[in-house]
Amino acid sequence: MKYTGITFRPPFEANSLLLQVTTGCSHNRCSFCTMYRDTPFSVESMEQIEKDLAEARTFAPHARRVFLENGDPFALSAGKLEEIALKIHEYLPDAETIAMYTSINNIRTKTDAELVRLRELGINQLNIGIESGLDEALTLMNKGYDSREALYELGRLRAAGMDYGANVIFGGAGPGRLKDNAEATAELINKTTPYLIFTGTIHADPCCPLYDDIQSGRFIEPTIGEHIDEEELFLELLELDNCLYFGLHPSNVVRMQGWLPRDKEAMLYEVRQTRTRLARRLGERPVRYGEGAILL
C-alpha cells in the first residue's frame, strides 16, 4: 500500500482500510494546522489506486469500511470519486462505507444530484473540520468559509443522506468570546445533526501562523478554567439524538466520551468534577506537548 509522507486518520477509523487517493490538503491554509504543510496537494493515479486495492484484497478481502487518504479527498470531482468508489466495490465487494476527510469548501463543488449519487455508492460519514460556528473564530482560523455557508452546505449533505462527523475546537475565538463561541457552535451543530462530534482545544505547533500570533501576544490562549467553562456550556446546549461525543484527544482538558443524549448528564458531571479537581490551576494557561497534549 502506498502512503506519501505522514498519514493521518481519525482515531475512530483505527479498524478501517486506509486507501490513499490524494496527498496533502487542497486548502492547507488553516492558521492552526501543520499536518500537511510540507506535503503538496496531488491526486493519486488510478493505476496506483487499483494496485493498492489489489493488494488490500489479499489481506483484507472482507473489509467493510474504507477511509480515503489524505487531507481532503472530497476535493476530487464527483466523477473521480465515483470512479474510485466503483473500483473499491469491484475489489472489496463487502465494503459498505467509504469515509474520508472533507471541508465545507469541497462540498460546495458538488451538485445535489452528485451528492446523492456518491451516497448511493457508499460514500458517507465524512469527517469535517467545522471547528466553530462563530464567524470571527472561523476568520481567525482561516477556514475559508463562514457559518452561513457551513449551515447551507451541511444541509445539502444531509439532504443527500450523508452523515458527517464534526470536529470542534474549543477556545478558537480567544478568551473574550468563549460564551459566544460555545453558543454559536452548538447552534450550528444542533441544526446539522452530525453522527459524531470530535473535540479538541485550540493549539498551534511551530511553523503555522497561529503559533506566531501566540508567541507575539496577538492571540491569547484561554486558561484551563476557560476551556472547561466553554465545553460545559457547549455540552449543555447540545440537543442531539444518537450522536457520539468523542472528547479523548490529548489536547482536551476534560477527556471523555459518551452518547448523546444518553450520557449527557454523566459527561457534564465529569466536566464539573474536573473543574473541582483542577481548582488551583484554573487560571493557568495549558502547557502543551506533541499534538497539543496538555499534561494534567
Identify what each model region corresponds to.
Residues 113-115, 174-191:
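Catalytic cores of alpha/beta
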Residues 5-51:
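Canonical Radical SAM [4Fe-4S] cluster-binding loop centered on the CxxxCxxC motif
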Residues 25, 33, 49, 68, ...:
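Conserved, mostly hydrophobic/aromatic
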Residues 63-69, 127, 164-168, 197-201, ...:
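Short beta-strand segments at enzyme active-site cores
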Residues 1-13, 190-296:
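Auxiliary Fe-S-binding modules of radical SAM enzymes
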Residues 49, 81, 111, 150-151, ...:
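Aromatic/hydrophobic pocket-lining residues that form the small-molecule binding cavity
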Residues 105, 133-137, 157-181, 200-206, ...:
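Conserved strand-turn element in the central/C-terminal portion of the radical SAM core barrel
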Residues 58-163, 239:
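Conserved SAM/AdoMet-binding glycine-rich loop
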